[in-house]
UniProtKB/Swiss-Prot annotation:
Domain of life: Eukaryota
Entries under SUPFAM superfamilies matching the protein: Family A G protein-coupled receptor-like
A GO cellular component annotation in the UniProt record: membrane
Principal location class: membrane
Localization annotation: Membrane
Residues listed as glycosylation sites in the UniProt record: N16
Gene Ontology molecular function terms on file: G protein-coupled receptor activity
Keywords from the named record: G-protein coupled receptor, Glycoprotein, Membrane, Receptor, Transducer, Transmembrane, Transmembrane helix
Transmembrane region(s): 34-54, 63-83, 102-122, 147-167, 178-198, 220-240, 261-281
Protein name: Mas-related G-protein coupled receptor member B8
Its membrane topology: Multi-pass membrane protein
Origin species: Mus musculus
Length: 330
């Protein structure tokens, strides 16, 4: 009897098990890619609604300017997120060369850096408003939010352009040290944002629950805290991935969970803010209450305590009535 026959059976069984595990992994990757696309579509819809309401139907304040820019950054990120999810979905079957990939990568970096910077700026500004309320409401420059948002967009754009010029336009191989150093600078900036965001939220929690002076819990505070929590959990994974990211030319995307998980978490991070605004704005006196999207968003970014809801609702209704009169006259 041939002694190699049992070895052949063992090898055949190991190959079947390996094929089954690889097939299951690819099926899971396929499901995660489809889920990422669905989440991105939901997030795009929510951010478009927020942009439309804050841009054309509501009076802006200091924090609504930040939220408007945050929604704009999330909208850009989700647009490219769908491109990468579709690319990852297709590459699980065969290689495809998407010429928009380089443009999508640059827009993704820009939108991601701007979005993380915006939520950090919102958290820090709210912390300053709680720490020094007199200075904030009396002596704070009127257009501070607009100036800060512009500077954050410009800084994010500069980092993105430097990444594109050094790592893509110039020869990637000969400028490896420069590209690596630039990636390190971006990661250090993300770590700074991570520390500032986490520490400012810890300071807010301490001020609210353990401070000597009673600080009221407003809906805006809840919105900021929940959004910051989602960013800390889901948002910084793609920054770590960027540090190790390397473009692989002419290769089929491997079936693994890491890349799909990063895509899924980044999509959740970018679509969370409209959902959080809808959730926070719908709660009134510990009960869910329906209303127009405009009223719900106004509640979610309300700086005053919950007892002053009636005044906010009256103002929103008056503004809505004025817009209706203008539309009828036109």
């Amino acid at each position: 009897m041939d002694s190699s026959f049992p070895d052949w059976n063992i090898e055949f069984r190991e190959q079947n098990e390996s094929y089954f595990m690889e097939s299951s992994s690819c099926d899971m990757s396929l499901a995660m890619s489809l889920l990422s696309i669905i989440i991105a579509i939901i997030g795009l819809t929510g951010n478009v609604i927020v942009l439309q309401l804050l841009g054309f139907h509501m009076h802006r304040n200091a924090f609504s300017v930040y939220i408007f820019n945050l929604s704009g950054a999330n909208f850009l990120f989700l647009c490219t997120h769908i491109v990468f999810s579709l690319e990852n979905l297709i590459r699980q079957f065969h290689y495809i060369d998407i010429h928009m990939a380089l443009f999508s990568v640059n827009v993704t970096i820009l939108a991601y850096l701007a979005g993380v910077s915006m939520i950090t700026a919102i958290s820090v500004e709210y912390w300053l408003s709680v720490l020094w309320p007199t200075w904030y409401h009396a002596q704070r420059p009127k257009h501070t939010s607009t100036v800060i948002c512009t500077l954050l967009w410009v800084f994010s754009l500069l980092l993105t352009l430097w990444n594109w010029i050094i790592c893509k336009v110039l020869d990637y191989i000969y400028n490896w040290d420069m590209c690596w150093k630039l990636a390190l600078i971006i990661v250090v900036w993300l770590l700074v944002l991570f520390v500032v965001l986490s520490r400012s939220n810890q300071a807010l929690l301490f001020r609210v629950f353990c401070g000597s002076q009673q600080t009221p819990v407003t809906r805006l505070l809840v919105t900021i805290m929940l959004t910051a929590l989602v960013v800390l959990i889901c948002g910084f994974g793609i920054g770590i991935c960027f540090f190790y990211w390397k473009k692989e030319e002419n290769s089929i995307m491997p079936c693994g969970y890491f890349y799909e998980t990063i895509l899924l978490l980044s999509g959740v991070n970018s679509c969370a803010n409209p959902i959080i605004c809808l959730f926070v704005g719908s709660i009134k006196h510990c009960q869910f209450q329906c209303g127009t999207l405009r009223l719900i968003l106004q509640r979610a970014i309300q700086e005053s305590p919950e007892e002053e809801d009636e005044e906010v609702e009256e103002v929103v209704e008056q503004e809505g009535g004025e817009e209706d009169e203008e539309s009828t006259t036109l």
